[in-house]
Structure formats: structure tokens, C-alpha cells
């Protein structure tokens, strides 16, 4: 569960309504793979990840980023039950994919950076703080199966 004030919930919802999930998702996942190259081991089937340019222009990275952000978007509709919302994804990433749960936190932080880049002054310190709470809650929910 993420504890957000009504103002924080409104800020998150208002900004999210303007997010291009495909564009932001691809950019966030791409940046994760570039900045934290060890995360690429989970995406060997994606083809060329040999350079930042290759990663950022890789159609499979973009498609998976969109998928990740679509799941995140679903979570925003269930802020009071993130563990339940992400239970199956947590199980998949833990039991089958063996993803280090720290990667969820890293991706959340990268997402906040990408949102800041896309929305500039509209991404105020208050909005940023609310999104930090949300991405921390999502990362915690995704890591739940690991505990």
C-alpha cells in the first residue's frame, strides 16, 4: 500500500493522464539497460543491445517498455492494493525469471527521471515526491514474493 494524500493522488493521476505509455515506457526501459548494463542479461532475446543507440532504438525494448508501463498504469488504479495487483508479476519475476528485486527500484527511479525530462516544469518537486512514493510502492509490491 502507498500512503498518498488526496493532493498527491490527484497530482499523480493528473500527470499520468498525459503520459504517452509507449514513448515513456520504451525510454525508461532503454535508459535502465544503458545505465545499468547488467540488467541486459534478462533481455538477451531482444537482439542488439551493444550500444546506447542500439538499445534506445531497439523495437523489442520499446515494446517491452510499453508493456511494463501498462502494468504500472494498472497499479495506479489500485494504489491501496499494490501487492495484490502485482502478485502474479512478482511471482513470475521471482520464480521463473529470477530478476534481482533491486532492479524494480532502479527502474522506478529511472521512470521518475524520464517523467521529469518529458514534463519539465510541470514535474514539480511535489509531483516528483508523490511519484517517488508510488514507484517505491510498486517496487516493494514486485519484490513481495522474494520475502
Swiss-Prot record:
Modified residue annotations for S-nitrosocysteine: 94
Superkingdom of this protein's organism: Eukaryota
Gene Ontology terms, MF aspect: haptoglobin binding; heme binding; hemoglobin alpha binding; metal ion binding; organic acid binding; oxygen binding; oxygen carrier activity; peroxidase activity
Domain Globin: 3-147
InterPro entries in alphabetical order: Globin, Globin-like_sf, Globin/Proto, Hemoglobin_b, Hemoglobin_oxygen_transport
PANTHER family: HEMOGLOBIN FAMILY MEMBER, HEMOGLOBIN SUBUNIT BETA
Function: Involved in oxygen transport from the lung to the various peripheral tissues.
Name of this protein: Hemoglobin subunit beta-1/2
Source organism per UniProt: Oryctolagus cuniculus
Amino acid at each position: 500500500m502507498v500512503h498518498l494524500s488526496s493532493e498527491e493522488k490527484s497530482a499523480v493521476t493528473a500527470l499520468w493522464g498525459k503520459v504517452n505509455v509507449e514513448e515513456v515506457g520504451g525510454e525508461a526501459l532503454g535508459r535502465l539497460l544503458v545505465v545499468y548494463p547488467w540488467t541486459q542479461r534478462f533481455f538477451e532475446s531482444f537482439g542488439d543491445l551493444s550500444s546506447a543507440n542500439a538499445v534506445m532504438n531497439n523495437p523489442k525494448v520499446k515494446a517491452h517498455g510499453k508493456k511494463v508501463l501498462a502494468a504500472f498504469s494498472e497499479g495506479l488504479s489500485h494504489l491501496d492494493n499494490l501487492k495484490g495487483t502485482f502478485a502474479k508479476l512478482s511471482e513470475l519475476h521471482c520464480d521463473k525469471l529470477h530478476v534481482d528485486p533491486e532492479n524494480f527500484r532502479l527502474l522506478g527511479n529511472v521512470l521518475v527521471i524520464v517523467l521529469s525530462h518529458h514534463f519539465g516544469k510541470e514535474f514539480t518537486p511535489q509531483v516528483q515526491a508523490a511519484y517517488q512514493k508510488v514507484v517505491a510502492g510498486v517496487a516493494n509490491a514486485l519484490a513481495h514474493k522474494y520475502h
